[in-house]
Regions:
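Donor nucleotide-sugar binding/catalytic pocket of nucleotide-sugar-dependent glycosyltransferases
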Residues: 2-40
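Conserved donor-binding/catalytic core segment of Leloir-type glycosyltransferases
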Residues: 4, 43-61, 67-70
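Nucleotide-activated donor-binding/catalytic signature segment of Leloir-type glycosyltransferases, i.e.
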Residues: 93-112
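Short alpha-helical donor nucleotide-sugar binding micro-motif in glycosyltransferases
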Residues: 112-113, 117-122
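Aromatic "clamp/platform" in nucleotide-sugar-dependent glycosyltransferases that forms part
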Residues: 130
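Short hydrophobic beta-strand element within catalytic cores of glycosyltransferases
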Residues: 147-151
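Short acidic/histidine- and often glycine-rich active-site loop of Leloir-type glycosyltransferases
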Residues: 153-172
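C-terminal "capping" alpha-helix adjacent to the active site of nucleotide-linked donor transferases
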Residues: 172-190
């Protein structure tokens, strides 16, 4: 018998918990929930100042924070362009944010698509989730060589984003202080 985890960090925490609370040391195997078949690089130049996110458009994914951060980043980086891939219940809210900020020229809702060959054309991937077990989109983005920005939360982001190496991990906020969160994201985008 054995346990399966999606990341080494989950495995380590599970072992620590068993060692702390039981005399039993289980056999734990890490099997990632996904993989990329090959690394993908752009055939030419990546689109300059291009940002992508891919997610269910759900409240817990906080894509609204990402859109607001791009609006704020545009004040310092007028060339920025943000494409949001995915569908879901928050789509109407995102459309309203885009319209309220007159951002139709640089923030685009792209719907659900096969992104296998899409990531490689962008420069930066944004993640707004504060709880990502593994994050297949993170794996796909890193497999295409994108810089990445996400929150410093266990598992997915900490697995794929190496702070100040291939991107930035935004420190966790105790409360959902939206203005501070949006400002922190915008600062790293710029």
């Amino acid at each position: 018998d054995f346990f399966i985890t999606a990341t080494e960090r989950q495995r380590s925490i599970m072992l620590d918990q068993f060692n702390k609370y039981t005399p039993f040391t289980p056999h734990i195997v890490t099997i990632p929930v996904g993989s990329v078949d090959k690394l993908r690089k752009p055939e030419g130049e990546r689109k300059p100042f291009s940002i992508i996110t891919a997610s269910r458009l759900a409240n817990e994914k906080h894509v609204d924070w990402l859109a607001k951060a791009v609006v704020k980043a545009k004040e310092s980086l007028p060339q920025v362009n943000f494409d949001i891939y995915g569908t879901g219940a928050e789509e109407t809210k995102l459309k309203a944010i885009i319209e309220e900020n007159q951002a139709q020229d640089y923030i685009h809702l792209k719907g659900h698509q096969d992104l296998t060959e899409v990531y490689k054309d962008y420069e930066l991937y944004l993640s707004g989730s504060k709880s990502e077990g593994f994050g297949l989109t993170l794996l796909e983005a890193v497999g295409s060589g994108l810089g990445m920005i996400g929150f410093d939360v266990r598992y997915g982001n900490q697995t794929f984003i190496k702070d100040n190496e291939n991107g930035y991990l935004i420190p966790r906020f105790e409360k959902d202080d939206e203005p501070a969160i949006v400002a922190a994201l915008a600062e790293k985008i710029v």
